[in-house]
A protein has these predicted regions:
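DUTPase catalytic domain/fold
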Residues: 1-363
Length: 363
């Protein structure tokens, strides 16, 4: 379920959780710096913390809880968001049987943004039991459905279960096997393709605001620096900077499943990956399996030190969750999905890279 911003935004001194001893309202009153009317387009500044009541509230049955994540567009714009509930002890979680209001914490990290009431930055999934699929279950699913394709459209020869952190850079070349290790391994693509040699985008600093209500309006060159495939197939990430990269794999999520991207292991590097972790049923699949996978776009930031990434380096894992029922409408153009069959795609506010290039006057 997409969650919509309400009519008021509060700028606060710091991020917080209310805990059991306080309400969100009392915490906001204690920490509030300013208040903004979202009935009109409103600028949110970078690295400031905002808390916004959402239009949705919940009255859940005792056996149903929830988990939230940023939407894809939110992650690609480096907007840090987290769901908060009254009495909540952790972000992004809704306890079973929760009845009450919902709030979202917003921190634009790279670009100032313009939002208004009704803007959708995050989404909520409801959970009843239904633990993530074990590797054994995932292997059985991979025998029935192709879950991973590669650039040539071919699926892997087989799904293989591996354990541990060996082969951090795939020795098989990344085009023979789908490696299952607490989910499907996800690796970086620093090679590019026949249609594009761009393997990453690095966000510029001190850019104009991005109005989230706009679609295909902004010139990518004003906000992003393209990184082309180096001969070494290696890229050094500058600490603190924000990058968009693509997975080597093209993933397919069958209609009866959803998926979630998680970091592979925090011990393999000081970086964060993929704010927007949900993959809807039908992602890279289509109505009847006719789509041969879709790349995952990875939002990556190195933290304290420069970080060297190599082609085919393991960077995350895709966890599959079985749905209670297959949805009536799958991910795709029929429901306005922006990123089906994507390559390395910027958020929908930006013009397609080739279109932006063709609009530049010739000298």
């Amino acid at each position: 379920m997409d969650l919509r911003l309400g009519n008021i935004a509060y700028r606060v001194q710091a991020s917080f959780l209310p805990g059991r001893s306080a309400t969100l309202g009392s915490k906001i009153a204690e920490l509030k710096i300013a208040e903004y009317d979202l009935s009109r387009p409103t600028l949110l500044e970078t690295n400031a913390v905002y808390v916004v009541p959402l239009l949705e509230s919940l009255a859940l049955p005792r056996d149903i809880g929830g988990k939230a994540n940023p939407k894809s567009t939110t992650g690609r714009l480096d907007i840090f968001t987290r769901l908060i509930t009254d009495g909540g002890l952790e972000f992004e979680r809704v306890l079973r049987g929760y009845a009450g209001d919902l709030y979202v914490e917003i921190v634009p990290r790279t670009f100032p943004i313009v939002v208004s009431s009704g803007t959708k930055l995050n989404q909520l999934r409801f959970i009843r039991g239904n633990p993530p699929s074990t590797d054994g279950v995932l292997e059985q699913l991979a025998e029935k459905e192709r879950l991973v394709y590669y650039e040539n459209g071919e699926g892997p020869a087989e799904a293989v279960i591996e354990r541990g952190l060996k082969n951090l850079v795939s020795s098989q070349g990344g085009d023979q096997q789908a490696i299952i290790d607490r989910g499907l391994r996800t690796t970086t693509d620093l090679e590019g393709s026949e249609t594009s040699s761009i393997v990453a985008y690095k966000a510029k600093r001190y850019c104009p605001p991005v109005d989230l209500s706009k679609v295909r309006v902004y010139d990518p060159a004003d906000f992003w620096v393209p990184i082309y495939s180096p001969k070494s197939k290696r890229v050094v990430l500058d600490p603190g900077d924000f990058y968009l990269m693509a997975s080597k794999e093209r993933f397919s999520v069958p209609p009866s499943y959803a998926a979630e991207m998680e970091p592979f292991d925090q011990s393999i590097g000081d970086f964060s990956v993929h704010y927007a972790g949900f993959f809807d049923p039908g992602f890279g699949y289509g109505a009847a399996g006719e789509i041969k996978g879709t790349k995952a776009v990875l939002e990556v930031r190195a933290h304290e030190v420069p970080l060297l990434l190599e082609d085919k380096q393991i960077i995350g894992r895709l966890i599959y969750h079985r749905m209670a029922n297959a949805p009536e409408k799958l991910y795709g153009q029929a429901i306005g999905s922006s990123y089906q069959q994507q390559g390395l795609a910027l958020s929908k506010q930006f013009k397609p890279v080739e279109a932006a290039r063709s609009a530049v006057p010739k000298s």
